[in-house]
Every structure is written in structure tokens, then in C-alpha cells.
Curated annotation (Swiss-Prot):
The PsaA/B heterodimer binds the P700 chlorophyll special pair and subsequent electron acceptors. PSI consists of a core antenna complex that captures photons, and an electron transfer chain that converts photonic excitation into a charge separation. The cyanobacterial PSI reaction center is composed of one copy each of PsaA,B,C,D,E,F,I,J,K,L,M and X, and forms trimeric complexes. The gene is psaB. The keyword Cell division does not apply. It comes from Prochlorococcus marinus (strain MIT 9313). Divinyl chlorophyll a B3 binds at M677, Y685. Phylloquinone binds at W686. InterPro entries: PSI_PsaA/B, PSI_PsaA/B_CS, PSI_PsaA/B_sf, PSI_PsaB. One of its GO terms (molecular function) is chlorophyll binding. Belongs to the PsaA/PsaB family. [4Fe-4S] cluster binds at C574, C583. It is a multi-pass membrane protein. One of its GO terms (biological process) is photosynthesis. This is Photosystem I P700 chlorophyll a apoprotein A2. It comes from the Bacteria. PSI electron transfer chain: 5 divinyl chlorophyll a, 1 divinyl chlorophyll a', 2 phylloquinones and 3 4Fe-4S clusters. PSI core antenna: 90 divinyl chlorophyll a, 22 carotenoids, 3 phospholipids and 1 galactolipid. P700 is a divinyl chlorophyll a/divinyl chlorophyll a' dimer, A0 is one or more divinyl chlorophyll a, A1 is one or both phylloquinones and FX is a shared 4Fe-4S iron-sulfur center.
Amino acid sequence: MATKFPSFSQGLAQDPTTRRIWYGIATAHDFESHDGMTEERLYQKLFSTHFGHLAVIGLWVAGNLFHIAWQGNFEQWVADPQNVQPIAHAIWDPHFGQGITDALTQAGASRPVNICYSGLYHWWYTIGMRTNTELYQGAIFIDILVAWLLFGGWLHLQPKFRPSLAWFKNAEAMMNHHLAVLFGFTNIAWTGHLVHVAIPESRGQHVGWDNFLTVLPHPEGLTPFFTGNWGAYAQNPDSLNHAFGTSEGAGTAILTFLGGVHPQSGALWLTDISHHHIAIGVFMIIGGHMYRNSFGIGHTFKEITDGHNTNHPNDPHKDGFREKIGHYGLNHNGITDTINNSLHFQLGLALACLGTAASLVAHHMGALPSYAFIAQDYTTQAALYTHHQYIAIFLMCGAFSHGAIFFVRDYDPEANKDNVLARVLETKEALISHLSWVCMLLGFHTLALYLHNDVVIAFGTPEKQILVEPIFAQFIQAASGKVMYGLDVLLANANSAPSLAAAGMPGDHYWMDLINASPEVSNFMPIGPGDFLVHHGIALGLHTTALILIKGALDARGSKLMPDKKDFGYAFACDGPGRGGTCDISAWDSTYMAIFWALNTIAWATYYWHWKHLAAWQGNMAQFNESSTHLMGWFRDYLWINSSQIINGYNPFGINNLSPWAYMFLAGHLVWATGFMFLISWRGYWQELIETLVWAHQRSPIANLVGWRDKPVALSIVQARLVGVTHFAVGNIFTFGAFVIASTASKFG
């Protein structure tokens, strides 16, 4: 007898309605809720999924390598990276006739192709790849790695090769392994690749499988390393006249501290990058020997955290705390076990760190690009900034989601009595109300300033605008070396201690050249009143998103309205039998509502980055400076003017190479708008609609020959909200992604 889906939940499998299908899909990855799941089995299944996850990433990379080698123009681009447009892949069947076929036959191709805006060409070129053959070899190597990963995932599900629960919970061993092996060795291995392959290639010296054992990466070999003369590796760096990829102006240094960027490639010096990675690798390997594992020496997390409490004789705060709260606190008692026994807590921390890193990458690629010539490919820069910022917001929302699930499923009040977690829960009203106050202050003041400026400009008196200079941010820029503001502080003052110390460092250094370059090159662009206002607008969005997420997590166990909320789970429905008036207070609902704010916030942040850079790249900073101080300036001079190019991708006079982006822009709007239908209409609407359709179906000839076993039941409100927020997010991303790429490409290619 065939088992009905889902096999992991007999309760759901026996549900006679369509709820069986949707709830089955919703809980497919919620391993904890599956029938017969033990803690050990849970860890083992998750461990195996890591191998699958890595395999998917590997297949993606291999697919990119293969398709660019097959259908791209990598070798032509390598010969002239500043003038040849990189091709992502061919378009096999361009619809809609000869017009679009001609429009998309671009970048020197003989057939319709897509232009590559992912930066992959720049990455592969920078790390030393030069030919299609090398791309094919890379794809094959990664495919072999993927096969090993898939085998490893399968193997670790077999009875003899399943790790034990104790192995998973040995936090010290895991930390040592992650620090020393995963971060330490891989950083040093990457330094090895840069020193042995990428840096020689950047100097016109090919290094491949045929000669990598015979080509010395440095004229003196390992002698300086073993004699302690490490400074030799920093001597004779590439000159400012170095032509990237050739020996012209090339030096011999492999580990430098030059600062700034390579004048021709616009990217960080490769020798600086190799120095960065070897330093991180060494620190990580030292860090990977800190925790007690095999030899009974080193730290344990439990001792560290238990020592951080005001009962401990060595705690410096014990007296002060007693005076303030009237009793001894147990700051970190129980925290180690709480984290070590909660996968949701660990995942929340990991997502928060990775989300922050993704946002950092977005900024880093614009301010300090590491790939050769990517700084001059403006469309790619804009696309990658947008891409990484959107990734960051979803990871951060996920961090708080799993924090909330931790409080519902894993938090033990007894084990955490009077420690820092318990205190956060006890003082949540103060935390939430303060955040609320900050949001209102930011929102009312920022909007009021914008609206005031809009009104006075509309009445023809722009001189009456309230324009606030961001003096604190300018102070930070000046402290880092920007001299245009006339603030003589730290590096902006040639006689300050940091400036004198920097001047005393041996060799040449180029940080000051970069920070004081023209706006389209400088990593610290000049800022003024428009930046001040949009900064506070973005701060409003960030604080409101944080407020919704933090409130959702801290109220996940219970609130004044619903003290026993934890008993209802993470995403309780509010449209079935049960408690009324609780529709917006599950922890899931907070994530759902925060996603809208997160999308709004990241749109504002990306609008800001994109418009300011468009102005800088076009040599017209005045447009941004004058128009960004009022809302109509943003609507008219950024959104409307840049949308016009995309909307022109389809018109009565024919089509152009922006047409695919134009259709994506339109389709994205439609998907986005569809979301509102699900967000506004609640369960009764869908149930009536479904019953009407069922009635019509059962009374229509031919159609009524097809029946179903599951009784059609409408979406719950939670499900409708999920469908709604998914359409909203996907539509938002498609619309803005198409906007960023098309509006930038129409100006710069």
C-alpha cells in the first residue's frame, strides 16, 4: 500500500484535506517535528545536509565555469578587460523575432548573448586564470569534489559512519577544528595560491601544472623565511606604473603593506591581499589551539562563562552588581549548555554573523575592491552591492527567527535562572519601549526635514531648506585621512602622532592617495546634507526592522496579552478554534512583518549607494547633492529619470538590448502587486472562493470527470501571509534588480 505524503508525519498523512499537502511542505525541513526523531538522529541528518549544501554550491560554481568557458568570451576579455564586455552565456532561442535577436547579438558575439554582471570574469582573472582550458579544468575539478561531497553526505547517514551525539556536542574540539583547520589552513592555502599563481600571473609570468614546482615565487625563495629576514618579502613591490598582467613596472615583493589600490586595475594590491590572508591564517591557527581537547590544557567554554558571574571570587563587578540589583547575579551561568544544546541558538548566531559579513562584503566591494578592473565595471559594481545587501537582510531576519524558535522550543528557565538571558527577558519592556522611542524620533524628525525641504522648494524658495552638515561623519572621514573638510584631526593632520608614525613606516604607502582621490575613485566619498538625511532614513528602517524582530523574539514565550504563548509554538494559526485577537503576535508574524521593513530599508540603502555612485561616475555630484535633500528629488531625479530607460526597452519603435530587463521590471511589478491580494484577503475569502470553484468544477461536463481525494481547504492566514510576503519579496527583488542593472548599463554598458 502506497504511503501518503508526508511519510515523516503520520498525523498529517491521515489528514483528509489539502492541508496535508501544504503543511507537509511547510514542515519537510523541520526535522525536530518529524515522527520518531531523536536528538542524535537530528544532528546526523543536519550534518549530512551540510555535505549536500556544499555540493549544490560546488555545482553552481562548476556550472558558471563551464558555461563561460563554452559560451563566453573569457580569452578575448582577458586580452582587453577595460573595453571588452564579458558574456555570461548564450541565449538559445530568442523569442519575438529578428529585432530582439539583433539587439542581443552584442559584445562581439555572433549570436544573442547575455552580458555578465556577476564579476566572475574579474575574480578568475585576478586569481590567475587566463584561458578557457583552465576554466574547463576548474569545472571538472569542482565536479569531482561535488561527487566526493555527495558520497560523504550519504556515507555519514550509514549506521557505521554516523557520528555520535557526544562528537557533535564537543564544542572545544569543534572550535579548534573550525579555527585552525577551516579558517587557518584555508587562509594560508589561499595565500599560497596568491603567491605561487596569482601574483606571478599579474606580472606576466604564467604558472600552471607544468611549471609550478620550478618557478620561484620570490627570487630569494625560502631563505628569508628561515633566517628571520621576513622584510625581504615586502621589498621591491610593483610600481605605480605597473601594467596589470604584464612584467612592465612589476616588482618582486609577495607580502606588502602598501595600502590604497593599484592605479591601473583599481583593485587592492595583490601583495597586500596575500599579506592579509597569511596574517589571518596565522592568528586563526594560534586561536585553534586555545581550547581544551586532547591534552587537558587550554580553555573550556563552561569555565570561561561560569567565571563571568558575580558569585565568582575574581569577578570585578560583584560588589557593584549587588548594590544595584540587591542580590548576586549569575551573569553567564548555564549559557554554555544553553547554546551547546540548542541548534536554533547556534543557527541564530551564525546567521547574524553571516548577514553582517554579507553587508560588509557589499560595502567592501565598492570601497576597497579586491578584483582587477571590477571598479571600472560600474554595472557589475552596482549589481553586486545590491545582491549582497539583499542577502544580508534575509540572513538577519532568519537570525531573529531562529532566536525566537530557541525561546519557544529550547529555552529552559530553570537552567538560565538569573543569568543574562533571563535578565534580557525580564527587562524586555524597557528594551522594546526604548527601541520604539528611537524609531519614532528618527521617523518624525527625518520625515519632517524632508517634507519641509519639499514644501519650500515647491514654493520656489530653496534657500529656506534646512540643510544639516554631517559633521560627525566628516570628522570620522578626516580622522581617516580625508583633508577636504579642513578638519585637522589624526591622519588629516600631517603633524599628528598617527601621521608621523605612518610617515615613519619603511617603503611607499598609498592610503592617503586613495582617500583623497576624486569621488568616483575614492573609498570615502564627500558627504553633505543629502547624505545626512538619507542616513537617518536608513537608520529609521534599520531600527524599526530590529524593533519588530527583537520584540517578536523576546515575546515568543509570552506577553501580557498572551502569557502562555510558548505552548502554541512558533507560528500558531489564529483562524481556527482557539484564542481570538492573536493574529499578529506569533513570533512568526514578527518575522513576516519585519521582512517588509527590511526590504524597504535595503531599498533605501541601495537607492542611496546607487544614486550617489551614478552621480560620481558621471562626474555630476552636484545633481545628487542638490536633489537628495527632498523627497521629490529622489522620486524625480533618481527613480523616474532612471526608470525611463527601462520602460523604453519596449516601445512602438522597436526593441533594444535593455528589453529583457524592461520585461523583468514589468513582471517584477506584477509579482509584487500580486502579493497584496494574499496579504489583504483573509481566510474566509479564500474558503468561499475555493468552494465556488469546487461547485463549478463538479457541475461542469468533462471537468467533473476529474475528482480528488483531499477535500479542498483554504489557506490559513499564516499560509496566505507567507504567499503574500513571498510575492512581495520576489517582486521587489526582480523589479529593483532589473532597475539597477538596466539604468546603469544604459549609461556605461
